[in-house]
Amino acid sequence: MELLDLKKQGINIKEQIPLSRYTFTKTGGEAEYLAFPKSTDEVEKLVKVTRENKIPLTIIGNASNLIIRDGGIDGLVIILTDLKEIKVKDNKVTADAGAKIVDTAFTAAHHGLSGMEFAAGIPGSIGGGVFMNAGAYGGEMQEVVESVKVLTRAGEFKTYSNKEMEFSYRHSLVQDNGDIVLSATFSLTPGNKLEILDHMHYLNALRRYKQPVEYPSCGSVFKRPTGHFVGPMIIKAGLQGKQVGGAQDSTKHAGFIVNKGGATATDYLNLIHLIQKVIKEKYDIDLHTEVRIIGKEK
């Protein structure tokens, strides 16, 4: 069986689609094939066909913390945003990989469950958030994840415990082994619904005030080096507001790179490399990217 056979069976598969339509940066080249599975069964079929036909496979969630190079991606790209069910039982919330982190956090809040307030403004998907152990305002996914259901590249379903996920700062096991996150279950604490929602609305207001939400952006680009803060280093190095092509280090929040109009992925990457070079020269600190960079050069 081949990919186009699955298309005939009703799986949503497109060809030669610009990924800039889906990324938060509004940049990125074309996907050779692009699929939007609507069920775990469809994901399993797609993975099996790519394995049997030796087709390269790339998994994407909400594409919020992602830069796709201008040459695009060969093989099949699966976007999981149509897998978005969120279920609540007792003190646990289970969300599909494509469910938005924000929607999951607010669903928990409306059920009077506390623990995901930190995630109220994180724009990514559950799969991506678990993949990178996303965090904000002092909280991280690893603090609330109870278990993660995955599909291995070999086609096996597994469930990992929190410990087995090997979470660390902006890292998890699935970054290393290539397993595909299908859903995650969060263990939360009963609380006062109105107080939880008030705190989430406060954090969202703070985010809008501090972050350049008015421009396309992939969020915070760099991991925080131990003992240092990226934003102040960029400001002191005279790099805030620096622009390469259409990509600019935000004048509102140093360390966020925004698309001021017409930016390419190459603009983003050239600006990232410039910032890394200058920070290394001035502070002898290596800045590592938090944002995921994939695809091929044009």
From Swiss-Prot:
PROSITE patterns associated with the record: FAD_PCMH
GO cellular component term, pick one: cytosol
UniProt-listed SUPFAM superfamilies: FAD-binding/transporter-associated domain-like, Uridine diphospho-N-Acetylenolpyruvylglucosamine reductase, MurB, C-terminal domain
CC cofactor: FAD
GO biological process: cell division; cell wall organization; peptidoglycan biosynthetic process; regulation of cell shape
Catalysis: reaction(s): UDP-N-acetyl-alpha-D-muramate + NADP(+) = UDP-N-acetyl-3-O-(1-carboxyvinyl)-alpha-D-glucosamine + NADPH + H(+)
GO molecular function: FAD binding; UDP-N-acetylmuramate dehydrogenase activity
Keywords: Cell cycle, Cell division, Cell shape, Cell wall biogenesis/degradation, Cytoplasm, FAD, Flavoprotein, NADP, Oxidoreductase, Peptidoglycan synthesis
Pathway in which this enzyme or protein is active: Cell wall biogenesis; peptidoglycan biosynthesis
Family to which the UniProt record says this protein belongs: Belongs to the MurB family.
Protein name: UDP-N-acetylenolpyruvoylglucosamine reductase
Species for this entry: Lactobacillus helveticus (strain DPC 4571)
Organism placement in taxonomy: Bacteria, Bacillati, Bacillota, Bacilli, Lactobacillales
Name of the gene this protein is made from: murB
